[in-house]
């Protein structure tokens, strides 16, 4: 909903540079593709909404799995082709962690891979290297079986292997302490899945 809101309305925002509007629109197309990817993997076909609607108007019929993949690829291709979306942010840049062409190539390649189109997936993954991304290597050149652990330390959260990563915030008191109640036990952080939707409640959303 929020991604569609930005995509459809950001052009009407006054006193904002057109290049910034284009970049933000591309970022939101990535996020819309991200959401529809996970919906399509789970349900193999869902209603496609490219505009904001009220809950009472959410009555579209279910689109096919192939149609959803097509929309996902279209959004990611728009990201890649957007000249105002950078390929990669430099370390220390205040925008590091935002969506880039590198993230769009990676996610489109990931999508092609899931679809079984390995040639296109490989082409996208190879394009990432051309943008300056590379596998993590310790700066001191010492190799060991614990190198991989260093990749996830705050000091390396902006290394060249990071394509799309949430940036560490060391300040305490951020976030929501109840979030752990909702996740599945197999998710990172060992969530508790204390709250589960009632099947009858879920069925209320099958409108078409």
Question: Where are the regions that the model predicts?
Answer:
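An aromatic- and glycine-enriched ligand-binding surface/loop that stacks and positions planar moieties
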Residues: 77-78, 83, 98-208
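Short, charged hinge/linker segments at domain and secondary-structure junctions
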Residues: 46-51, 138-141
């Amino acid at each position: 909903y929020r991604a569609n809101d930005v995509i459809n309305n950001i052009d009407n925002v006054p006193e904002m540079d057109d290049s910034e509007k284009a970049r933000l629109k591309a970022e939101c197309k990535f996020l819309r593709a991200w959401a529809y990817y996970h919906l399509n993997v789970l349900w193999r076909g869902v209603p496609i909404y490219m505009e904001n609607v009220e809950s009472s108007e959410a009555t579209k019929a279910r689109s096919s799995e192939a149609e959803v993949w097509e929309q996902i690829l279209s959004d990611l291709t728009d990201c890649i082709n957007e000249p105002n979306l950078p390929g990669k942010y430099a370390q220390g840049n205040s925008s590091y962690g935002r969506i880039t062409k590198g993230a769009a190539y990676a996610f489109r390649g990931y999508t092609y891979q899931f679809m079984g189109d390995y040639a296109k997936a490989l082409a996208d993954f190879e394009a990432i290297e051309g943008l300056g991304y590379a596998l993590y290597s310790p700066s001191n050149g010492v190799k060991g079986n614990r190198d991989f652990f260093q990749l996830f330390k705050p000091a390396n959260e902006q290394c060249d292997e990071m394509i799309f990563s949430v940036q560490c915030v060391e300040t305490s008191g951020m976030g929501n302490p109840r979030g752990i109640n909702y996740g599945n036990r197999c998710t990172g952080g060992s969530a508790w899945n204390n709250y589960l939707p009632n099947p009858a409640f879920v069925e209320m959303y099958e409108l078409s």
